[in-house]
């Protein structure tokens, strides 16, 4: 059985953001605006997304 995945897209810049939030974006694998990645839907990933929710768009 395949694990459920989610698509995460960075929609706002990381310039002038908290260092912790920049690090969270890097941890998610996002590098630039409109960069989209597909991640496995886990509680840890969801927590990271919640922390930077104002900078990313999530598609189920």
From Swiss-Prot:
It comes from the Bacteria. GO terms for biological process: translation. One of its GO terms (cellular component) is cytosolic large ribosomal subunit. Keywords: Ribonucleoprotein, Ribosomal protein. InterPro entries: Ribo_uL30_ferredoxin-like_sf, Ribosomal_uL30_bac-type, Ribosomal_uL30_CS, Ribosomal_uL30_ferredoxin-like. Gene3D superfamilies: Ribosomal protein L30, ferredoxin-like fold domain. GO terms for molecular function: structural constituent of ribosome. Pfam families: Ribosomal_L30 (PF00327). Belongs to the universal ribosomal protein uL30 family. Part of the 50S ribosomal subunit. PANTHER family: LARGE RIBOSOMAL SUBUNIT PROTEIN UL30M, MITOCHONDRIAL RIBOSOMAL PROTEIN L30. HAMAP family: Ribosomal_uL30_B. This is Large ribosomal subunit protein uL30. It comes from Histophilus somni (strain 2336).
């Amino acid at each position: 059985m395949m694990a459920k995945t989610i698509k995460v897209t960075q929609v706002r810049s990381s310039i002038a953001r908290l260092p912790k939030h920049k690090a969270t974006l890097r941890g998610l694998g996002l590098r630039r605006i409109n960069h989209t990645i597909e991640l496995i839907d886990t509680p840890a990933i969801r927590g990271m997304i919640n922390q930077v929710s104002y900078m990313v768009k999530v598609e189920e």
